[in-house]
């Protein structure tokens, strides 16, 4: 899905922030 692609790009750019990003996506 689009959200999965966004998360992958975020992981590539800022791997440290992925944990918070996933929590935010999961909350939504």
Swiss-Prot record:
It is a peripheral membrane protein. Its main location: mitochondrion. It is found in: Mitochondrion inner membrane. Pathway: Energy metabolism; oxidative phosphorylation. Keywords: Membrane, Mitochondrion, Mitochondrion inner membrane. The keyword Membrane applies. The keyword ATP-binding does not apply. One of its GO terms (cellular component) is mitochondrial inner membrane. GO terms for biological process: oxidative phosphorylation. Component of the cytochrome c oxidase (complex IV, CIV), a multisubunit enzyme composed of a catalytic core of 3 subunits and several supernumerary subunits. The complex exists as a monomer or a dimer and forms supercomplexes (SCs) in the inner mitochondrial membrane with ubiquinol-cytochrome c oxidoreductase (cytochrome b-c1 complex, complex III, CIII). Belongs to the cytochrome c oxidase subunit 5B family. Component of the cytochrome c oxidase, the last enzyme in the mitochondrial electron transport chain which drives oxidative phosphorylation. The respiratory chain contains 3 multisubunit complexes succinate dehydrogenase (complex II, CII), ubiquinol-cytochrome c oxidoreductase (cytochrome b-c1 complex, complex III, CIII) and cytochrome c oxidase (complex IV, CIV), that cooperate to transfer electrons derived from NADH and succinate to molecular oxygen, creating an electrochemical gradient over the inner membrane that drives transmembrane transport and the ATP synthase. This is Cytochrome c oxidase subunit 5B, mitochondrial.
């Amino acid at each position: 899905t689009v959200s999965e692609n966004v998360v992958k790009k975020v992981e590539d750019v800022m791997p440290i922030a992925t944990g918070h990003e996933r929590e935010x996506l999961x909350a939504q």
